[in-house]
């Protein structure tokens, strides 16, 4: 519709956001296994009686302690069972959105009978790997997902191979929207946000709608660690100021509370993560309301936030030892700074200060405590913006921060890609020892 007005680079930016910013019901690592199980079950005519599943260490890490929506249970086995018995394989990250109460009961019964086994895939060279093999009588079907939460690479049944993905991913990556985005810069992203027609990016307002609803639910209910609602009570007790900084903290953490606590509402995700989507969205929403921004300004700020978050995260492994709420909050810092003064220098300084502040935060698996890290990252983003508005930032003379924001980002991502690989192994070992 907008091709005549939008150059190819901008089209790639829009497509990158449409690929990476999607609704997702439930934490995306268990959901990836649920999708594999649902897709496998769809290949069978009979009722699924048994499930064997294999996942990568990183997916195991992020699936051990998180609640699966609608079940009140945590972990990968219930996700696999519910995916097979009540999932919609065509719904992607919303695979469990229509799961019935009967499907939940049947899934719990399957677990109780010991008919679901989830194991580590060994050896495994893939950071994100999930495979589900489901059985019905003498028939079976097996689906493998690799690299991305919904990227099905192989479907096989007892009758033979149904589907296998062509092995040209590296060549396609260079020309994909994400590949194009990764070779641009924050300055080019800002130029796009300032000039793109509003109608071409209006869709990003859905992020505010979905994640705003999660935030409201988090404040209403007692989800997860209920950080948001607890801090709201402290405001009423006079222990926290009722100001913009506190509103950012409370509303962002409340959305993550609901998300990780198993609320049956979808999050608008970013880079395959609901918490990253929440972090890139809610702080920007709160500041937009504070400054009286209309829908167009909100959409531009959200587009800057989400695109910046994707741009940074694409330089990282899909899953790693680095808590990616921090990189999503760098996007939020860009969006909030843009709403207040719109200058590139302010945005760059805010991101540099973020890298100097929260870059060491580890990911120790998806759980209710993610809301703590989301709230910390959101608060750090606002602090960095406030500093940048006064032309103050962590400089290239300090730590891993460079004199150029692009190099600062590269320095951060090199830590996650290299040095933190051993950290990741140690985290997984510690978590595995707790499980026994």
UniProtKB/Swiss-Prot annotation:
InterPro entries: Ser_deHydtase-like_asu, UPF0597. Belongs to the UPF0597 family. One of its GO terms (molecular function) is L-cysteine desulfhydrase activity. GO terms for biological process: L-cysteine catabolic process to pyruvate. This is UPF0597 protein YhaM. The gene is yhaM. It holds the Pfam family SDH_alpha. The lineage of its organism: Bacteria, Pseudomonadati, Pseudomonadota, Gammaproteobacteria, Enterobacterales.
């Amino acid at each position: 519709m907008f091709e005549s007005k939008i150059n190819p680079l901008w089209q790639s930016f829009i497509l990158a956001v449409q690929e990476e910013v999607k609704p997702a019901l439930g934490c995306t690592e268990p959901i990836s296994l649920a999708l594999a199980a649902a897709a496998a079950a769809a290949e069978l005519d009979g009722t699924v009686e048994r499930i064997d599943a294999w996942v990568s260490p990183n997916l195991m890490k992020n699936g051990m302690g998180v609640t699966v929506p609608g079940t009140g249970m945590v972990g990968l086995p219930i996700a696999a069972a519910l995916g097979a018995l009540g999932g919609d394989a065509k719904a992607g990250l919303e695979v469990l959105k229509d799961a019935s109460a009967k499907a939940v009961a049947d899934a719990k019964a399957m677990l109780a009978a010991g008919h679901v086994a989830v194991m580590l895939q060994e050896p495994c060279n893939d950071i994100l790997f999930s495979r589900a093999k489901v059985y019905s009588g003498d028939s079976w079907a097996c689906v493998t997902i690799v690299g991305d939460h919904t990227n099905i690479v192989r479907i096989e049944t007892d009758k033979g191979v149904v589907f296998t993905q062509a092995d040209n991913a590296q060549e396609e990556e260079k020309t994909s929207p994400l590949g194009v985005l990764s070779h641009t810069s924050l300055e080019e992203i800002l130029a796009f946000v300032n000039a793109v027609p509003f109608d071409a990016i209006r869709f990003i307002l859905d992020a505010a709608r979905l994640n705003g609803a999660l935030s409201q639910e988090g404040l209403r209910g007692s989800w997860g660690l209920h950080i948001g609602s607890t801090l709201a009570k402290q405001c009423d007790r006079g222990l926290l100021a009722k100001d913009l900084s506190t509103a950012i903290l409370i509303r962002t953490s409340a959305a993550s509370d609901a998300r990780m606590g198993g609320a049956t509402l979808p999050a608008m995700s970013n880079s395959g993560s609901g918490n990253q989507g929440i972090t890139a969205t809610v702080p920007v929403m709160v500041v937009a309301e504070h400054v009286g921004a209309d829908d167009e300004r909100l959409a531009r700020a959200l587009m800057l936030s989400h695109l910046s978050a994707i741009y940074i995260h694409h330089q990282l492994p899909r899953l790693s030892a680095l808590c990616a709420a921090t990189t999503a909050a760098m996007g939020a810092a860009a969006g909030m700074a843009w709403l207040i003064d719109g200058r590139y220098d302010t945005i760059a300084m805010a991101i540099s200060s973020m890298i100097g502040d929260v870059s060491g935060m580890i990911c120790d698996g998806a759980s209710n405590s993610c809301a703590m890290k989301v709230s910390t990252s959101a608060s750090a983003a606002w602090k960095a913006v406030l500093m940048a508005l006064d032309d103050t930032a962590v400089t290239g003379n300090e730590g891993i921060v460079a004199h150029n924001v692009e190099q600062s980002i590269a320095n951060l991502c090199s830590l996650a890609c290299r040095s933190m690989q051993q950290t990741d192994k140690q985290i997984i070992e510690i978590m595995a020892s707790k499980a026994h």
